[in-house]
A protein has these predicted regions:
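Conserved beta-strand segments of alpha/beta enzyme cores
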Residues: 2-3, 54
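Amphipathic, hydrophobic secondary-structure cores in small proteins
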Residues: 9-55
């Protein structure tokens, strides 16, 4: 699984990193985005809806922030 570490970066940087790197994984695979900017909590799911990518789940990270899991749809 591809992990994108965007901890410490402010939005829209985590979204830009996701948009650039999701192409590195095959369709059907999952990418994890680690982010601690509160805006990412709404921006990542919104990006998935806009780009027709599957938002699988999110989990809180022990150090703060979230791990967002997105399945590449196309």
């Amino acid at each position: 699984m591809l992990v994108i570490d965007a901890l410490g970066r402010k939005c829209p940087i985590p979204i830009i990193m996701l948009a650039e790197r999701i192409r590195e994984i095959p369709v059907g695979q999952v990418v994890a985005v680690l982010a601690d900017d509160p805006a990412a909590h709404t921006d990542v799911p919104a990006w998935c809806r806009m780009k027709s990518q599957e938002f699988v789940w999110e989990e809180p990270l022990p150090q703060g922030g979230w791990g967002f899991h997105i399945r590449r749809s196309y």
